[in-house]
C-alpha cells in the first residue's frame, strides 16, 4: 500500500477536514477505503497504507472538478 490523500469519486477532490477532528473523520473515512488509518494533514484527509487500486490525489493530476 501507499500513503496519500484519498479523493472523492468522480471529482478528484480531496476530503477537507479540520485539524483536531482527524480521528473522528479521517480515520473512519480511510478505513472505508480499505486503508489502515488516516488523519488530517494540511486540511485534508491523509490515509496510511492505501491499497494500490484506490485512487489518490495526484494519480489523475491535481485538478479538482467539484
From Swiss-Prot:
Glycosylation sites (chain numbering): 9
Residue ranges constituting the LCN-type CS-alpha/beta domain according to the UniProt record: 2-65
GO molecular function, one term: sodium channel inhibitor activity
PTM summary: N-glycans are core-fucosylated, heterogeneous and short which could be the result of extensive trimming.
Pfam families recorded: Toxin_3
Matches recorded under CDD domains: neurotoxins_LC_scorpion
Cellular location(s): Secreted
GO cellular component terms given for this protein: extracellular region
Disulfide bridge partners, by residue number: 13-64, 17-40, 26-45, 30-47
Domain of life, per lineage: Eukaryota
Tissues of expression: Expressed by the venom gland.
Keyword terms of this UniProt record: Disulfide bond, Glycoprotein, Secreted, Toxin
Gene3D superfamilies: Knottin, scorpion toxin-like
Primary localization class, coarse: secreted
InterPro entries: LCN-type_CS_alpha_beta_dom, Scorpion_toxin-like, Scorpion_toxin-like_sf, Scorpion_toxinL, Scorpion_toxinL/defensin
Keyword Transcription belongs to the record: no
The UniProt record lists the keyword rRNA-binding: no
GO BP, sorted A to Z: defense response
Domain notes: Has the structural arrangement of an alpha-helix connected to antiparallel beta-sheets by disulfide bonds (CS-alpha/beta).
Function statement: Beta toxins bind voltage-independently at site-4 of sodium channels and shift the voltage of activation toward more negative potentials thereby affecting sodium channel activation and promoting spontaneous and repetitive firing. This toxin is active only on insects. This toxin has very low anti-insect activity.
Family under the similarity heading: Belongs to the long (4 C-C) scorpion toxin superfamily. Sodium channel inhibitor family. Beta subfamily.
Entry protein name: Toxin Aah6
Upper taxonomic lineage: Eukaryota, Metazoa, Ecdysozoa, Arthropoda, Chelicerata
